[in-house]
């Protein structure tokens, strides 16, 4: 019974243990057994500093403090009415927001949330912000403790600002001071944001006087290149032969791919790759028997018929200039070991063939053999040991990564026939040239010449692989052999080498390059401090790297950015992605993942866009957008720039007058555009025949297509999409597309038209579409000098004067110091002269900093932190509660309805003195709901009630 009574006593006394712990300075959890059933409470014994050694064991004697310790000092009867010495009211959790979190000082504890809020409030009102300044910087939003969104500090409303002013102040003076306060608040936020981000690359590219000019010129170069490609396609009829309809998706994709190949520097010969069937679906299928494909590859390599063609690169996928991926951060375990096993056999065979073909070696070749014998022996030893140790690993890797084996097998089988035919066709016209060149050389037979030529072509084409894989070449002994075989024909057969070099160029020209297809990696996390040069330096170690694109930072992501790294199509993108995931930049995990190819490149828009009335409206909108964007980047401004009349006409066209389209722009797409903007209707005929539009409004009319208008619109839509990266039917712009993996990836086209459409639907659609395109229709005008002056613009000479004063220090009488150089002068005027003469670059930096800041202020769409939710939208009940302080959302309930006995000496009956309305006086004990009953709410507080 003792154990059961003890357990019952423990449960009864510890019923409110969790509530008491937050009121006391020390924890009273030593009453819990250490070895109890609750696993989470096992560590409580280690937290109690007052527990003795006896309590460490489960059965030892435990210190049991008297239960009266929880009640404070003094004796207290166990039974009877508690009177006014009640325990505190039940404490609600702070995150509920509707309970009283104040601690009762009787229990010796305090609430950290309450005191922290009071300290912040007291310091903000009486020390740093006593002159009605700004609130302490609060970067979190109201709702949320877990939100990562950055916001500005909450600004005081008029009522809160009035509490900080003198009582005798007039209304006009209050309004003037409050206006100044809001202006200063905005200036401070802009200045803080500028100081926080001025050293980041994305910010410099926007506003720095030097970096922004370079970036704008780079973008203008991209646009000029796109314009040249578009004009080339417009002249050869490629643009006019396609309609921007979803039914012509293949033709649209071909036009976009043609643009990409041209932008990448491709030729008309490279465009032939668009006629070939795509082989990607075959590449990504996993073979059931991977070892069989390897055997087939070895058969094709060992066959004597294929000696000429087996060393050629694959024309459909790999060009002669491309290099395979070199292993990154891998010593022995590489994903491409199976490729090395395949590539080692043809290299050795080629070396043997070249040795047999060279029947008359010269003295120089013998000397070179002697010098390279050591390298060959050492490399052969290394390769033999490495091959024997990693043979089992290679078999496993071949079974796992058999995609590349299947790719090589199928591509080589398909490409062998084409290569044989190409070599036969080329050897026939070139044979007389070879005879003419080698007419004087009678010692070598022709069959030997052809054999040497074959070896020369093979070695030349394989040289990129050798140079791109230095790690693999050191493990295998093939590199020295191949290098030796390359040098043999170059010593004795100089004339033959020259002839074969010309032939090799012709072979390369005949191979179309799929420049429109790339592989890419998506970087989910890029810190704002990471620069483009750092990413490029990291990616340049990987073979096949092309470019990198970095998006603008977003405030929702705490100014973190996203990035896309583009590589050639034939690289092992998964291995590169694995290598990037093992690296960190500035202690930032980039989160690299493989970027998939685009699934749907042509996406349908509303079919009502094919209606004649909608098409005419779209032509007008497209012309406006093209004019604004052309002038923004000065694409067609070379000729009319010197003519004041044309410049004046351009200004009128920007203001929206449609009569100027095509007359002032040198853009051929906009020539004579006004002829298609004038509506035509048979109004007289309808009036004479008594036709009305009532039936059309109720039943609707069928879609009317005007092919001439549609052809004009399609030319404008493709111009916006190719040149300015504006997808008109998606009313959006694809930014930094020239640096993205897909330069012309997605386009929206007209979808299937509906059967009938009403006039109301047409008008609503036109109005809605014009609203969505407003960002392109309105011209972005920088702020004037007067406007940026109100925002806190700086003056260059004033800042230079401040810089001089800051670097002029008086040490003693007639003794002044310049901190920049450490020299001492007799007067400040000498320091000024010294700074302007010897530290002119520092003065120029100050002037650039001023221009940097003013450029940021001039941008009407400048990035900045969003307003605090408490500033723009405040709760209606905040003023009624008489609390909050205006600096941050209250983390605790108002001061009214406090439990009996609460009264910190500092706070008294109000909130920090006269600046806040006094709190309601404390209510008597009867309002703590000890007894439940009804009474008149309007009655006095001390009215008689039943006890």
Curated annotation (Swiss-Prot):
Tell me which residues bear Phosphoserine: 81, 303, 330, 354, 357, 431, 646
Query: Which positions carry Phosphothreonine?
Result: 300
- Chain segments carrying region Disordered: 1-100, 285-493, 643-666, 855-890
Q: Where along the chain is composition biased (Acidic residues)?
A: 330-341
Instruction: Decide whether keyword Transmembrane helix is in the record.
Output: no
InterPro entries according to UniProt: SE/Ars2 (IPR039727), SERRATE/Ars2_C (IPR007042), SERRATE/Ars2_N (IPR021933)
Q: Which GO terms describe its cellular component?
A: nuclear body; nucleoplasm
Where's it found, cell-wise?
A: Nucleus
Residues modified as Phosphotyrosine: 79
> Where primarily located?
nucleus
Q: Name one Pfam family in it.
A: ARS2
* Extent of Polar residues compositional bias: 465-477, 647-666
Bias category Basic residues: which stretches? 367-376
Q: Which GO terms describe its biological process?
A: defense response to Gram-negative bacterium; negative regulation of viral genome replication; primary miRNA processing; regulatory ncRNA-mediated post-transcriptional gene silencing; siRNA processing
Provide this UniProt record's keywords sorted from A to Z. Answer: Nucleus, Phosphoprotein, RNA-mediated gene silencing
* Domain of life from the UniProt record: Eukaryota
Q: Which protein family is named in the record?
A: Belongs to the ARS2 family.
Q: Partners and quaternary state? A: Interacts with cbp20, Dcr-2 and pasha.
Record function comment: Acts as a mediator between the cap-binding complex (CBC) and RNA-mediated gene silencing (RNAi). Involved in innate immunity via the short interfering RNAs (siRNAs) processing machinery by restricting the viral RNA production. Also involved microRNA (miRNA)-mediated silencing by contributing to the stability and delivery of primary miRNA transcripts to the primary miRNA processing complex containing drosha and pasha.
Protein's name according to its UniProt entry = Serrate RNA effector molecule homolog
Protein species of origin: Drosophila sechellia
């Amino acid at each position: 019974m003792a154990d059961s009574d003890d357990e019952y006593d423990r449960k009864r006394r510890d019923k409110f243990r969790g509530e008491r712990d937050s009121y006391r300075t020390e924890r009273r959890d030593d009453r819990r057994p250490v070895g109890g059933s609750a696993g989470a409470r096992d560590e409580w014994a280690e937290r109690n500093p007052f527990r003795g050694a006896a309590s460490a064991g489960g059965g030892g004697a435990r210190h049991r403090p008297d239960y009266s310790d929880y009640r404070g000092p003094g004796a207290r009867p166990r039974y009877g009415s508690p009177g006014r010495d009640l325990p505190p009211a039940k404490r609600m959790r702070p995150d509920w927001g509707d309970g009283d979190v104040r601690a009762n000082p009787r229990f010796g504890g305090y609430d950290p949330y309450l005191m922290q809020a009071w300290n912040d409030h007291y310091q903000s009102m009486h020390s740093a912000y006593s002159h009605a300044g700004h609130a302490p910087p609060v970067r979190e939003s109201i709702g949320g403790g877990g939100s990562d969104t950055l916001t500005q500090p909450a600004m005081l409303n008029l009522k809160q600002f009035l509490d900080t002013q003198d009582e005798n102040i007039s209304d006009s003076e209050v309004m003037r001071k409050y206006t100044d306060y809001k202006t200063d608040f905005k200036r401070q936020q802009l200045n803080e944001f500028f100081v926080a981000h001025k050293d980041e690359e994305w910010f410099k590219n926007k506003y720095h006087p030097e970096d922004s000019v370079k970036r704008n010129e780079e973008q203008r170069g991209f646009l000029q290149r796109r314009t040249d490609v578009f004009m080339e396609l417009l002249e050869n009829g490629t643009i006019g032969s396609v309609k921007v309809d979803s039914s012509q998706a293949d033709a649209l994709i071909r036009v976009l791919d043609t643009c990409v190949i041209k932008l990448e520097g491709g030729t008309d010969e490279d465009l032939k790759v668009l006629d070939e069937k795509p082989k990607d679906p075959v590449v990504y299928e996993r073979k059931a028997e991977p070892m069989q494909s390897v055997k087939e590859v070895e058969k094709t390599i060992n066959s004597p018929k294929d000696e000429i063609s087996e060393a050629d690169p694959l024309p459909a996928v790999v060009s002669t200039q491309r290099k395979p991926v070199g292993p990154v951060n891998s010593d022995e375990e590489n994903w491409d070991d199976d490729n090395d096993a395949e590539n080692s056999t043809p290299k050795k065979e080629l070396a043997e063939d070249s040795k047999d073909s060279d029947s008359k070696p010269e003295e120089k070749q013998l000397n070179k053999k002697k010098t390279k014998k050591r390298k060959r022996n050492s490399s052969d030893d290394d390769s033999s040991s490495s091959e024997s140790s990693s043979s089992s690993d290679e078999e496993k890797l071949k079974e796992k990564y058999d995609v590349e084996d299947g790719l090589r097998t199928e591509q080589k089988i398909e490409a062998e026939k084409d290569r044989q035919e190409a070599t036969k066709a080329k050897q026939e016209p070139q044979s007389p040239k070879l005879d003419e060149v080698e007419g004087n050389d009678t010692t070598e037979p022709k069959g030997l010449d052809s054999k040497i030529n074959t070896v020369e072509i093979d070695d030349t084409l394989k040289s990129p692989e050798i140079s791109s894989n230095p790690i693999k070449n050191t493990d295998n002994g093939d590199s020295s052999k191949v290098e030796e075989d390359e040098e043999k024909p170059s010593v004795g057969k100089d004339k033959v080498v020259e002839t074969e070099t010309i032939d090799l160029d012709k072979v390369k020209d005949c191979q179309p390059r799929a420049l429109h297809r790339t592989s890419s990696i998506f970087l989910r996390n890029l810190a704002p401090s990471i620069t483009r040069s750092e990413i490029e330096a990291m990616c340049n170690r990987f073979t096949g790297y092309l470019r990198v694109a970095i998006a603008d930072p977003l405030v929702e992501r705490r100014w973190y950015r996203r990035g896309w790294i583009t590589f050639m199509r034939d690289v092992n993108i998964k291995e590169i992605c694995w290598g990037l995931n093992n690296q960190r930049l500035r202690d930032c995990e980039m989160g690299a993942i493989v970027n998939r190819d685009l699934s749907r490149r042509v996406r349908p828009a509303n079919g009502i866009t094919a209606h004649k009335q909608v098409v005419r409206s779209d032509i007008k909108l497209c012309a406006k957008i093209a004019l604004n964007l052309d002038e923004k980047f000065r694409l067609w401004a070379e000729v009319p720039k010197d003519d004041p009349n044309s410049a004046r006409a351009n200004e009128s066209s920007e203001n929206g007058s449609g009569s100027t389209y095509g007359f002032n722009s040198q853009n051929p797409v906009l020539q004579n555009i006004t002829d298609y903007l004038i509506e035509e209707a048979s109004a007289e005929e309808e009036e004479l025949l008594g036709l009305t539009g009532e039936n059309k409004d109720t039943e609707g009319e069928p879609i009317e297509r005007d092919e001439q208008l549609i052809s004009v619109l399609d030319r404008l839509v493709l111009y916006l999409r190719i040149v300015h990266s504006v997808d008109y039917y998606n009313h959006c712009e694809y930014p930094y597309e020239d640096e993205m993996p897909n330069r012309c990836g997605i386009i929206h086209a007209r979808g299937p038209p509906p059967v009938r459409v009403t006039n109301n639907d047409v008008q609503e659609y036109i109005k809605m579409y014009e609203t969505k395109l407003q960002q392109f229709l309105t011209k972005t005008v920088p702020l004037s000098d007067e406007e940026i002056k109100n925002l806190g613009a700086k003056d260059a000479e004033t800042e230079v004067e401040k810089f001089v004063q800051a670097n002029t220090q008086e040490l003693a009488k007639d003794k002044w110091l310049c901190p920049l150089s450490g020299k001492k002068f007799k007067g400040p005027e000498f320091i000024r002269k010294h700074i302007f003469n010897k530290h002119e670059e520092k003065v120029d930096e100050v002037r650039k900093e001023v221009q940097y800041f003013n450029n940021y202020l001039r941008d009407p769409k400048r990035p900045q932190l969003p307003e605090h939710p408490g500033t723009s939208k405040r709760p209606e009940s905040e003023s009624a509660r008489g609390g909050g302080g205006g600096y941050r959302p209250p983390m605790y309930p108002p001061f009214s309805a406090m439990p009996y006995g609460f009264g910190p000496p500092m706070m008294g009956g109000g909130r920090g003195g006269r600046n806040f309305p006094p709190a309601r006086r404390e209510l008597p004990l009867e309002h703590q709901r000890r007894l439940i009953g009804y009474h008149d709410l309007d009655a006095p507080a001390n009215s008689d009630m039943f006890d």
